[in-house]
Design a protein with these regions (language model features):
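Gram-negative outer-membrane beta-barrel transporters
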Residues: 350, 354, 407-413, 422, ...
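Membrane-embedded beta-barrel scaffold of Gram-negative outer-membrane proteins
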Residues: 192, 308-323, 471-475, 502-571, ...
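C-terminal beta-signal and adjacent terminal beta-strands/loops
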Residues: 116, 478, 538-539, 543-545, ...
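Extracytoplasmic beta-strand/coil segments of soluble accessory domains associated
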Residues: 71-122
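Structural signature of Gram-negative outer-membrane beta-barrels, strongest in the C-terminal barrel
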Residues: 265-267, 356-360, 364-366, 391-535, ...
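Outer-membrane beta-barrel domain signature, strongest for Gram-negative TonB-dependent receptors
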Residues: 246-370, 520, 524-526
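Periplasmic-side early beta-strands and strand-to-turn transitions of outer-membrane beta-barrels
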Residues: 185-191, 195-288
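Short acidic/polar hinge/loop motifs at secondary-structure boundaries
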Residues: 111-153
Length: 747
């Protein structure tokens, strides 16, 4: 393993902690041991926490079953989904038909993820039959480092709710306490997973130590390394191989990740934590290198008025394209995204008679910069000026927020007020001479665009009885245009739109929670959440093609009077309607458990031309969710709960893809995917002892042939064309029956 910066910093700390272990364990013998307290729904199923919270919130635990990937876990959330793109190496969360930076605020340990990945198309390694590059915002994180994900739909408190139109998803990584066994000061956590049918393998090892310091403090640290082998040359349910499709070649990759943390508690009132995480991969014609460093602290003295939290972080992600890889005709390209954030907030609590209140107020700053390098020595000047690749610019967001919770009797009112200042900086090039008639302004200039948004929200809940809580809410959210939208470079200055406005949404929700224990059996627990939501989105941003039509522009290619054609982002003149139902169910007992979710949704959001690969450059993804979808997990606990058996049923309703070709007017065609069957997975976990857990599984037990909804390759321009039906076939089938095994070792 390569000793990088994280290793050099943390290894000495681990050694110091280990040297103190003997002394600490001797001291621990004098500490009184308390009786064991059983807490339901905090580790195996963290979602139980949300059945007593008003609003659309969900949580999922990670790494419970062997080789159950992040896409499957997030898609089990009502209202949640993912955009699948095997060429990006990350996870892209979709909430209520929305995805991408600002529409969904995706975070890791509270740090926003701003990476935009772009795959190559040249060099014979990828898209060998002409499929173009594809781009997608995604989160580069190793699943083995994760413990849970918390998803808020529609709105979230604090920094997670800033610049988040449809919601947020926060992935939580392992801490020292997740590695150490009870009363141990040094520990190791190791995971290994393997799947046949080219699912691949992955492994992780994490070392941690913790020692008492000063009078009531502690010093802990961890160092973790993970590596995977991933490929897409699998056998489909119909017996064919994925590699039979040329666009599925060149996807084998070996990502590796490092993570380190140092946590110092000088006393019981305060804590400081320094974290570092690095992700490296070589995928689809480019090297990816992403690093995040953060410092967080908290201070909570014996006062109801002070609960101070601080977080600052910097993330830098680089993409360097291989010498033999191309983006359309571009060579030797590279991109860099650097993000810095700062958040400071305090929580105050007070009571007056029957009224209790909680107020959280804070400030949040984010600086987000994108840059690219296209060497003039290797690229034609015209190709550089008209490259639909890696727009450059800066995005600054400054925010103030106030979140409150008021409780009086059976009533709970959660209210928020978020104020944000959006700023976009970049350069609008001068328009080409042929484009002057349609370009405004036609000259080149530096753009410095500012917008301001004030978003109030409120949720009122009624605790009618101990187990039943209905609630209603009104939420306003917004998001800034992204650099890639305002400074789109597909046709030099003509495709840049410096007049874009932020998106804003008004969302109404009505729902209820049921949360009760001892329902059917002693020590069982039941949770149910049902929510209806209705959103109206103003100034929705999307990408369209425009054509030269005499003295003006038009949207239909059949009306064009010259060869002028360009793509540009605009604000939709009509309000986008987004509505649906979300239901989540969880039941747990000593003998068996049930987890379920159901989503039904519809949206009038227009599809961006950029979602088409051949004609729209693949600059973004198609995000319309299936009409409805559901996940049901049934499980049993045997042998004194050492053996857990579970079956997962995944239902997907009618789903679409963006057509590979366009209609006669040059507009997007939406095509219905073939009916997707119910997919069944089986898993078994056996806890040999506190040190060893063995895992096995079978994915797609019935070996069904189907397409995953919202898979970017469903619309690959390299799909086979059927001349008899004048359509492109659906050949991007998912993985057939696959066997998995895994082990988790702790000591």
């Amino acid at each position: 393993m390569k000793f990088n910066t994280i290793t050099r910093i943390l290894l000495p700390v681990l050694c110091i902690v280990a040297s103190q272990t003997t002394f600490a364990e001797e001291k621990a013998k004098n500490i009184m041991e308390l009786d064991t307290v059983t807490v339901y729904g905090t580790v195996e199923n963290p979602n139980f926490e949300n059945f007593s919270k008003a609003g659309s919130v969900s949580s999922r635990a990670m790494n419970v079953n062997a080789m159950q990937n992040l896409d499957s876990i997030v898609r089990s959330v009502a209202g949640g989904y993912t955009q699948i793109d095997p060429g990006q190496g990350g996870v892209s969360v979709n909430i209520r038909n929305m995805s991408g930076l600002g529409r969904v605020n995706t975070l890791v340990d509270g740090v926003p993820q701003t990476q935009l990945g772009t795959s190559a198309n040249g060099g014979g390694k990828f898209h060998t039959d002409g499929n173009g590059p594809m781009s997608q915002f995604s989160t580069l994180i190793d699943q083995n480092f994760l413990t849970r994900v918390d998803i808020a739909k529609g709105y979230n408190n604090g920094a997670a709710g800033l610049n988040a139109l449809a919601g947020s998803a926060n992935f939580k990584t392992i801490d020292v306490e997740d590695i150490l066994l009870e009363q141990h000061k040094v520990g190791v956590l190791s995971r290994f997973n393997y799947g046949n049918n080219d699912l691949g393998k992955n492994g992780m090892i994490a070392l941690a130590g913790k020692v008492d310091v000063l009078e009531s403090g502690s010093l802990g640290s961890l160092l973790a390394f993970s590596k995977s082998s991933i490929s897409q040359n699998y056998r489909r349910g119909n017996g064919t191989m994925a590699s039979d499709s040329a666009y599925m070649q060149g996807l084998k990759n070996h990502p590796e990740s490092y993570m380190g943390k140092i946590a110092f508690k000088p006393n019981q009132d305060s804590e400081f934590k320094l974290s570092g995480r690095q992700y490296k991969n070589s995928l689809v014609g480019r090297n990816i290198d992403s690093a995040t460093y953060s410092l967080e602290s908290s201070y909570r003295p014996q006062s109801d008025w002070i609960d101070l939290k601080f977080l600052t972080a910097v993330t830098e992600t680089k993409q360097d394209f291989h010498d033999d890889a191309k983006l359309w005709t571009l060579e030797d390209a590279s991109t860099k995204n650097k993000m810095w954030m700062f958040d400071l907030n305090n929580t105050s609590r007070f009571e007056s008679g029957k009224l209790s209140a909680l107020l959280t107020y804070g400030v949040n700053l984010m600086r987000n910069k994108y840059s690219r390098d296209l060497p003039e020595s290797k690229n034609n000047d015209g190709a550089i000026r008209n490259a639909a690749f890696g727009p450059a610019g800066k995005q600054n967001i400054d925010s103030l927020y106030l979140d409150t919770e008021w409780k009086y009797g059976i009533f709970t009112l959660n209210s928020s007020l978020h104020y944000s200042r959006y700023q976009l900086k970049g350069y609008k090039p001068e328009c080409d001479s042929d484009d002057m008639d349609y370009c405004f302004p036609s000259f080149g200039f530096d753009v410095n665009k500012k917008h301001y948004k004030l978003n109030p929200s409120a949720t009122l809940a009624f605790q009618v009885v101990d187990w039943f809580q209905p609630f209603v809410s009104y939420k306003q959210t917004s998001r800034s245009p992204n650099v890639q939208e305002m400074f789109n470079t597909s046709r030099n200055g003509l495709s840049v739109n410096p007049f874009l406005k932020p998106e804003s949404a008004k969302t109404y929700e009505i729902g209820f929670n049921i949360h009760q224990d001892n329902v059917l059996l002693n020590n069982d627990i039941l949770g149910l959440k049902a929510v209806y939501f209705n959103s109206r989105i103003k100034d929705y941003l999307y990408n369209l093609s425009l054509y030269g039509c005499g003295p003006t522009v038009c949207r239909n290619s059949s009306d064009a009077t010259n060869a002028i054609q360009f793509q540009i982002y605009v604000n939709h003149p009509e309000k986008v309607k987004n509505r649906g139902w979300e239901v989540e169910l969880a039941y747990d007992s000593d003998a068996f458990f049930v987890n379920g979710s159901y989503t039904r949704t519809e949206s009038t959001a227009p599809t961006s031309k950029g979602a088409t690969i051949l004609y729209g450059f693949g600059t973004e993804a198609y995000t319309q969710l299936p009409k409805d979808y559901a996940t049901l997990e049934l499980g049993a606990k045997l042998l004194d709960k050492k053996l857990t058996l579970s079956s997962i049923f995944k239902y997907t309703g009618k789903a679409k893809r963006v057509g590979i070709d366009l209609d006669e007017d040059g507009n997007i065609i939406h095509e219905q995917l073939p009916n997707i069957p119910v997919i069944i997975d089986l898993y078994a976990n056996y806890k040999v002892n506190k040190h060893l857990t063995l895992k096995v599984g079978v994915q797609n037990v019935m070996n069904r042939n189907y397409l995953d909804a919202l898979n970017a390759y469903n619309s690959s321009s390299s799909e086979e064309y059927d001349s008899d039906t004048d359509t492109y076939r659906f050949t991007n089938s998912a993985r057939g029956r696959t066997y998995t095994l895994g082990a988790e070792v702790r000591f």
